[in-house]
């Protein structure tokens, strides 16, 4: 038996004399200059983030059955950046402000793992249990007004997962999870953008969701050089419910679109192990959702785009043990996502927030002598330019041009008896580029360069 207890506290606030200056999307970066921040602004960052869990593990609590039970909780308060009142795009009743997130969670999970042995060629693992999560969250402004009221949810979810191996080489996975979620929404007033907008007073109530989701997978591994697999799974989430409620246009919950997002996910691929020195992996996946979860900008605010969506892509990887002390590898991921337009055609691309640019990563690991290592890593992210400027000649937020990035990182280390020393140099060539977030968001004030060369020395002492 084993009992494990963990507590973690994190706090990070930004107190700086610098304020943003300049910045023109696709032309010049925003930089920090000495200045005074707005007197209404407070330090942004995480005021507190408490995390704790208690875990109990028991091997063979019953015959051929292990138990893992845990209780966990967290409490978070994060303040975002200050937004100056902008008459062209008013928000929060035409005032300046700073939004925040307050979140509290408490959960319980009990999981059993049973082993069934029918013969040398047929056996099964069964994982089954129960999840419970209590979550209370809100999005206030630091001045006391509520952009999103306190939402309280309870999620009960029993689950079952079976993995069976037949004839030693055929693996079958089958599972299911039933979610029962109730969300309590209080009576609240929608925080208007303009004072002239009609006041919407929403009558609260209880939102209830019940969903059964399944997954199934097959794999065959008799031949090391070709091990195919295929899988199907269903996804379920009440994605961005708070974002929907804070932009409500109706006064009762029944008139507000609060339906959950359900996805059907398909994957097919193969794994190959060639003489234990070269491993190859490739897969193609496809996901469809009748009710989408992409985000779009509406009068300066993010809202959920409920248009049907599909996402597809490929993932490829290769790892080679060239020498006993030399290893190299690469992996490639490419995604694309489209929305179904009013004409019934899949002719609209999903935003850069949901779909990243293609990514290629390569590495070389070398151990020149015992207890030392060197790693050189190259990362390339591709270009994603799927959208045209709007009528005013500007790119909508989330639809900006994401340009190519090429980075080289170096890590070296040595393991000694009393400590481990490591040296990491990120962006080794001091490559100048804009952050992907600033490129996709297309905001002048946030169009900023990423970090240049950064050197980190770490020492871990053993006792």
Where is each model-derived feature located?
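Residues on the lipid-exposed face of transmembrane beta-strands in outer-membrane beta-barrel proteins
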Residues: 1, 52-58, 108-114, 158-164, ...
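Face-selective signature of the C-terminal outer-membrane beta-barrel domain
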Residues: 2-10, 45-195, 219-224, 231, ...
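Transmembrane beta-strands of outer-membrane beta-barrel pores
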Residues: 9-13, 73-77, 132-138, 178-184, ...
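Outer-membrane beta-barrel translocator domains and adjoining extracellular loop/strand segments
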Residues: 16-24, 79-88, 137-145, 184-193, ...
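Extracellular loop and loop/strand-boundary signature of outer-membrane beta-barrel proteins
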Residues: 35-43, 55, 91-100, 139-150, ...
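Membrane-embedded beta-barrel scaffold of Gram-negative outer-membrane proteins
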Residues: 66-84, 219-239, 243, 257-312, ...
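C-terminal beta-signal and adjacent terminal beta-strands/loops
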Residues: 328, 370-371, 380-389, 413-463
